[in-house]
Amino acid sequence: LISKEIGQSVNGRSINHLMLGTGKTKVLLWSQMHGDESTATMALFDLFNFFHADDEHNDLRKLILGSLELHIVPMLNPDGAQQWKRRNDLEIDINRDARMLVTPEGRALMSLAKKIQPVIGFNLHDQSTLYAAGRNDNTATLSFLAPAYDYPKSMNEVRKRATQLILTMNEALQTKVPGKIAKYDDAFDPRCFGDTFQGMGISTILIESGGFYADPEKQYIRKLNFYALLNAFVSIAEKTYVNQNLADYEKISENSRSLYDVLIRNVSISKEGIQFRTNLGIVRSQIKGPDFGSMSYNGRIEELGDVELTHGYDEIEASSLTLTPGNIKLMRKSEWEALSPLQELELIRAGYLFVKWTDGTSPSGPLKARLLNLTNKETNTIQTASIGQQAQFLLSRDGKPVYAVLNGYVLDLTKDVTSVPNVFGY
């Protein structure tokens, strides 16, 4: 493994290029050009560990490293990664800078590509977890694209090779996550590195890490990246990708923004003096900690109404349920501190979602390791469902809470669930 600095970020952080393999076919991989997209970065280090191991897979390593020369930039945007943000410290999206090359990070990548002249490139990203593979409940766990290199979306040998490699990876991944692989729209954008590299003769493949149920940290998706890339390397080494039929690319489902974190169907809501049944979609957004080293979540109502052809990671059929506001429990700070998770759960079952201290002002912002929210208000201002409102309410049957929605997380009150990632202080 050879490591070289190919440039520095806006704030002087090293951008490193690692090389391994002695083969004739050069392959370039780069990750985290968007600083808050790190799933593939982890997978690249899994690959480094794999290639430096000594076990029953030595023949596979010999095949790949003897056939390919791998050039890897695991973190193109270290400033963005440090602050967990998409853009660099000039506030420019590096992946929209392939033409102007204003960013030092973009210049470093372009310079490397021109210097080594790879045959194949892998552009590694994360996408929202709310994309589906088609208009169904299959999450788009990984999405692919063989970018166009011109506005007519022409297909030459360079783009054909990228498409065939996608089909090779899709074939392998369908055995692990059937139905959960999608493809991106291929509208040409000359600002993007993938489109530009394709036009430069580098067969470029975009891989986007999306969502998978009960994998919020994308650790399973990390493994799928590793698996997909390893299969691609073998196919490149053995040139088996040439057997793929281009027509099969059209059979891969389109990427579709049609998921919610929580979808509640047919719930009864009272609003503006009217009682009606409708559907309610909730999404959870990330909140960066002050040190950029921790993450909290903010669950809000994104949709009310007809949600045709949309689905949720968690779904509740609420045709017998009514949305009801949570009550506020008054207690001293010391009493709140002494509450066990099961005691908090019992208060929620009794209809409480908030605690107000009677002897002081409680903190605002995300609260971890608690179930009940804190409030400094005399009354609960969340009395019904509104677009953009934080998702803090009960679903009740005949006046008895059946589910609690706490900051966009669903608690089935028939079960002893005693944790959510975070609630809030108001």
Predicted regions and their residues:
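Short glycine- and acidic-rich boundary segments immediately preceding or forming the N-terminal edge
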Residues: 1-15
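Conserved beta-strand scaffold positions in the cores of enzyme catalytic domains, especially
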Residues: 3, 17, 72, 121, ...
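Short beta-strand/turn micro-motifs at beta-sheet edges
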Residues: 12, 81, 192-196
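Active-site-proximal beta-strand elements of phosphoester/diester hydrolases
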Residues: 16-17, 28-30, 94-95, 206-208
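Active-site/substrate-binding loop(s) of hydrolase catalytic cores
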Residues: 24-26, 33, 38-170, 179
